[in-house]
Amino acid sequence: MLTVYSDTHHEQAGKAELINGTLMPCFENPSRADMVREAVDAAGFSRIGPTDHGKEPILAVHRENYVRFLETFWERWSRPSRRSATGRDYDALPLIWPTRCFRQVEPEDIDGQLGYFSMDAGTPVTKGTWTAIYGSAQTALTGADRLLAGEKGVFALCRPPGHHAAADVFGGYCFFNNAAIAAQHLRDKGCSRRLSP
């Protein structure tokens, strides 16, 4: 079986998540994917890196303002502001969640946006989040392309994971819904809703 894997996942290495009112070490961390990669290598499966498909396939699933928020977050978070004269160099966890059902107005403030686009306080945004999530999406897309090229079995080892991510919400350790991105990519390439065995 062919495995698609990228070391960029190491860039998402949050220090803590909020669990039951206590900051705890992040459960979802690089060692999880490293263990799987080691097992894949030990089994003798071939491994390739992802190819860059750009942001267009990501934007086919996720809203543009959300993708822009994630791509520019760290630069905005770390610049000097009224909250920090020297800028913030620590992981970001939301402290407020602007209620979307009352007002569909995206906050302009970075702290407001952090809550607006998140569903929990257990998914830290770090300096390397964009690099890791972009690489994870490219991994899924490369796996989809290899299936299109006739490969019989492909394992896209995506980290951070993506199954909890919505069109414009992150949480549950997930930022981009890699499975949805790959599925939409396959649909856009002419595949039916179901692949034949």
Show which residues each predicted segment covers.
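HDAC/HDAC-like amidohydrolase catalytic core signature
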Residues: 1-197
